A protein has these predicted regions:
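Membrane/wall-proximal cationic-aromatic binding patches
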Residues: 13-112
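A general structural motif
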Residues: 83, 115, 142-143
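Active-site flanking residues adjacent to catalytic metal/cofactor-binding acidic residues
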Residues: 2, 89-90, 148-150
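Active-site micro-motifs of SAM-dependent methyltransferase domains
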Residues: 6, 94-95, 154
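Conserved beta-strand elements of the Class I
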Residues: 87-89, 119, 146
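Interaction-surface signature
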Residues: 11-43, 129-181
Length: 181
């Protein structure tokens, strides 16, 4: 009985949510969030030097994007002396949807450890393919460590669901010769 309830009400509501999300992206005529710019390789990327409010029913936070297109304080490409630099890439979880800058896990690590400088390269909607394509830019910051905050809930599907924020992004296809196309 419990399994039937879960399949009928919980599983079907999740399926409906996904369908309506896809429908919303297909019918969107513009980017509902003003934090992103079109990018010919990545599909979209964070804006440079942007400040605005990100609001949904459950939260309202100020968002500041620096000159390097990171939701972070201004950073130099030159490393600080006596600190290891950690670059973190990821999707909306890393970017910090729903939380203030000070509440993001990368900011907490950076604030509570004097031996590390943590740079947050998170971009909402990114997945493994865009992490790979983003890597050349991240390496220009000379990180000692590069971490990927991988979200099992959607990072695999982000490789094939290739439209976000009214922008098309890179996607993968399977072919006889296994490679990224």
């Amino acid at each position: 009985l419990a399994e039937g309830f879960v399949r009928l009400f919980i599983a079907s509501s999740n399926q409906w949510e996904i369908i309506s999300e896809i429908k919303a992206y297909k019918t969107s005529t513009g980017n509902p969030y003003k934090f992103y710019d079109f990018d010919s390789e990545l599909g979209w990327k964070n804006k440079s030097n942007y400040r605005g409010i990100f609001q949904r029913d459950e939260f309202k936070h100020e968002v500041t994007l620096n000159n390097e297109r990171m939701r972070d304080k201004e950073v130099s490409r030159k490393k600080q002396k006596n600190k290891q630099r950690i670059a973190v890439m990821g999707d909306s979880f890393t970017w910090g949807v729903g939380v203030k800058d000070s509440e993001r896990f990368t900011n907490i690590i950076d604030k509570n450890n004097n031996n590390y400088e943590v740079l947050n390269f998170g971009v909402s909607g990114y997945g493994p393919l865009t992490y790979f394509l983003q890597l050349d830019n991240i390496l220009k910051f000379n990180p000692d460590i590069v971490l990927i905050a991988f979200c099992l809930g959607n990072d695999f599907s982000d490789n094939v669901f290739y439209r976000r924020y009214s922008y098309y992004g890179p996607f993968t296809v399977l072919s006889n010769n296994p490679k990224i196309e």
